[in-house]
Regions:
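Short aromatic/hydrophobic "clamp" motif used to bind/position activated sugar donors
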Residues: 87
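Glycine-rich, basic loop-to-helix element that forms the pyrophosphate-binding segment
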Residues: 66-82, 92
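Acidic helix N-cap motif at the loop->helix transition within catalytic regions
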Residues: 18-20, 45-53, 95, 99
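Membrane-interface aromatic/basic loop that binds lipid-linked glycans or pyrophosphate carriers
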Residues: 271-326
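Catalytic core of nucleotide-sugar-dependent glycosyltransferases
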Residues: 208-215, 221-249, 265-292
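A conserved acidic beta->alpha catalytic loop
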Residues: 25, 40-50, 68, 91
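Short, acidic, metal-binding catalytic loop of nucleotide-sugar glycosyltransferases
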Residues: 24-33
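Donor-binding/catalytic cores of nucleotide-activated saccharide
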Residues: 71, 92-202, 212-226
């Protein structure tokens, strides 16, 4: 077993504005032999120069440069060179709060079979850092079955497939051949597979991750039809992974229902916030896959049986929210 507990993998591409703040937030709690692996995805700005200027003298900060292939490919390359027992995928424009490494260390010492470490996260606006809101909020805590953690997140509406949402034992990736496959939505299948393949999770109520929302991204980032179709394909692939899992039957049935409802809502909201019609293939998926689901509320019944009415009602809510965003 490696003496290195944690490898933090940071995929970087043209993030000269953010990389120092990100790495500095990690260095406050990471010392050798733990390591920070910066995977330079062929940046064309000053990212590499800044990393060399600030961190070339630190043994725990390592940088590798690869041909441009997207964040998922960069994470895969980072896993290949990582020497830690655990890996943590951190985005280069975000910030990690103090305490993550110390709690992880204590958990692994007390519960050595833990292979997934989950924590809360928040988001903040780049132009107004004092404006923050919860991102991932766990309702469970302590030692848990990872599939129960996933179900609870789906139920409370704070599940995200983002790979920065957990710390993972590296052998899980190796034994199950987990990889980030695509440039876009590359983490959907990976993250769900993580929750399904892991055997023991520790859930803390501490908020250790702070996601930066760049200026204008809430309202001004128009998404193309290709984006929505790729997002839909990621949903289908991930749902198929869930259906093929070997989870206990009642739990699997509950996870399938929760994941479908979560995904249907999310794809609808993505279109509404983009101020574009919900694609017909999404509506067809709701009509076809929704037939296997028994609604637990009026809102779920509308979503599954009359998606057009559900969309109309939610569109009024979204329009009001967009008007409030300065």
């Amino acid at each position: 077993m490696s003496d290195i507990l944690l490898s933090v993998i940071i995929p970087t591409y043209n993030v000269e504005k953010y990389i120092v703040e990100c790495v500095d937030s990690l260095l406050r709690q990471i010392s050798a032999p733990n390591e920070i692996i910066i995977v330079n995805d062929s940046s064309t700005d000053g990212t590499v120069a800044l990393v060399e200027q600030h961190y070339s003298h630190l043994p725990q900060v390592k940088m590798i440069t690869i041909a441009n292939g997207g964040a998922g490919n960069a994470r895969d390359k980072g896993v290949e060179v990582a020497q830690g027992q655990f890996v943590f995928f951190c985005d280069p424009d975000d910030v990690v709060a103090d305490g993550l490494v110390s709690e992880l260390t204590q958990v692994v010492e007390n519960y050595p079979d833990t292979d997934l470490f989950c924590f809360n996260s928040s988001a903040y606006r780049e132009d107004k850092p004092h404006i923050t809101w919860p991102k991932v909020r766990h309702s469970l805590s302590g030692i848990q079955r990872p599939q129960d953690v996933l179900l609870a997140l789906l139920h409370n509406g704070s599940y995200t497939s983002a790979a920065w949402n957990y710390v993972l034992r590296k052998t899980v990736i190796q034994q199950h051949h987990l990889r980030f496959v695509d440039r876009v939505h590359e983490d959907h299948n990976f993250t769900l597979s993580v929750f399904m393949k892991c055997k023991q999770a520790w859930v803390t109520q501490q908020t250790y991750y702070k996601q930066r929302i760049r200026s204008g991204s809430l309202t001004n980032s128009s998404k193309s039809p290709t984006f929505f179709f790729q997002r839909y394909n990621a949903f289908i692939a991930t749902f198929n992974t869930l259906c093929s899992s070997r989870a206990e039957s009642e739990l699997k049935k509950a996870l399938e229902k929760a994941y479908l409802i979560h995904s249907f809502r999310l794809m609808i909201y993505l279109s509404l916030y983009n101020q574009t019609p919900v694609p017909e293939y999404v509506l067809n998926a709701i009509r076809y896959l929704g037939r296997r689901i028994k609604a637990s509320s009026l809102k779920e019944w509308l979503l599954l049986n009359s998606p057009e009415t559900f969309i109309l009602l939610q569109s009024h809510k979204v329009k009001k929210e967009l008007k409030r965003v300065p």
